[in-house]
């Protein structure tokens, strides 16, 4: 029986946040030497990060790694700040999606955006640097939210340019962050996740506005 205050429709969301926090918490404690062993983070990245080279001629650490990494990378983060920003965003966007869709639809968008973000990163990212973080999936959630808003505005003959303005703002923000981070921002995953989430929003069921 769920305790008061826990929404049963948010169980997958709770689980995602918990898993990401536990993993990064353990890695951060390992970095400080409290648990684990030297270079524990590097080893976890070796097995769980998204490595574009594994889609070419690199030898995987285990047979399923070239496929599993399309999902596992989204559970890893580069540090506590990276984790905090992504989990706060996941909590906010996740609830917004679950306000309009079922838990199953949320899973479709989130996992689909993880796959789509990784695929676009593999195609467009220069070099063979690895990728970690849930931001591809987060942009997928945002893409779904904006797609539903566009659909609602279209049905109500509202201002559809509002959605276009938000998309352009997001593109500009990614450009600024990419420059500020000296090209280390995985904008390709953001783009792929967003497009996947947008498309998924047109394919899955959602609650009408009046029933939210």
Question: Residue locations for each model-derived region?
Answer:
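A detector for small-residue-rich transmembrane helices and their helix-helix packing motifs
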Residues: 1-212
